[in-house]
């Protein structure tokens, strides 16, 4: 089963919005075992859309459209497909009633062109829009399955999950279970990770292993197929165990977890609090933590100690130490972590100092980083890193390494 996704909308070609619909649909189709071989983006032009459809008809037996189902003149997806397939457009009474109720409820006049949103291809299966007005539709014609979905993601995603997915399962008799699991890694590059599990990747068939690198992290998507859901999950468990036996130290979570959500979760489980002294990261570490629900149970406070004056006056770093060792040093990172922990009466103090670049500082090249971690009742530890990349990349990777080292420390305590 080969699919093509055609996104309709000039705003996509102009770069005004990103085509997140194609990403979502590709993920959903992969879980159904349907191959997506092409993504096409077409502006609001009937001629070019017709040409794109004719091309797709030569190479796909499932074509999914997003966008162009609205009330205005440039919403032309339905009209173009109707003309190509020789189908009439007819009013779906249920959709029309829903549109009328919406305008009545909001006390707004319903213009005549809004009726256009209730038009569907004759003989199609109507996909109800429970989050907007224009319904989707799906049909099979001359051996090709067509599915038309609205453009707004808040309408398209729930529609596909509830109705589009079920239509495809019925149409293509998709009884096989597709189970996926994402393993998330940090502190190891894509090439090193792939080398460590090269034989597992080479031998893959079911489950499959798909590496992906980005934002200083690496993910492995494991996908298994089986008629029985429990057996598909067992297959995933088996290959996951083999992977973690080799690179488990670097695996911090699954699926949509992040280093920050995992760190917050582990600290909450311990009942521990944290405070940060941030020079290099400028508050980025605490910004990421406090953006999460439940952060108030964990975060005591922090200091952005960007200058040596603040390090000395607020956090008590002795001037002789700053003059002798510099702010970018192990002794400074150690004392920053210890002092911010004590000042905020937290269980853990963490510090970030270093050089984000692009210029050297105190004789240190860009990417030089020190992260200090002080736990109540213990000696502080300091991690030294040499990172590469842009200024922004070094700062966010430093904050992530702070989480990674915290998770390592918490795991070792278990």
Curated annotation (Swiss-Prot):
<dbReference type="InterPro" id="IPR036425">
    <property type="entry name" value="MoaB/Mog-like_dom_sf"/>
</dbReference>
<dbReference type="Pfam" id="PF18146">
    <property type="entry name" value="CinA_KH"/>
</dbReference>
<dbReference type="InterPro" id="IPR036653">
    <property type="entry name" value="CinA-like_C"/>
</dbReference>
<dbReference type="InterPro" id="IPR050101">
    <property type="entry name" value="CinA"/>
</dbReference>
<dbReference type="InterPro" id="IPR008135">
    <property type="entry name" value="Competence-induced_CinA"/>
</dbReference>
<dbReference type="InterPro" id="IPR001453">
    <property type="entry name" value="MoaB/Mog_dom"/>
</dbReference>
<protein>
    <recommendedName>
        <fullName>Putative competence-damage inducible protein</fullName>
    </recommendedName>
</protein>
<comment type="similarity">
    <text>Belongs to the CinA family.</text>
</comment>
<dbReference type="InterPro" id="IPR008136">
    <property type="entry name" value="CinA_C"/>
</dbReference>
<dbReference type="Pfam" id="PF02464">
    <property type="entry name" value="CinA"/>
</dbReference>
<dbReference type="InterPro" id="IPR041424">
    <property type="entry name" value="CinA_KH"/>
</dbReference>
<dbReference type="Pfam" id="PF00994">
    <property type="entry name" value="MoCF_biosynth"/>
</dbReference>
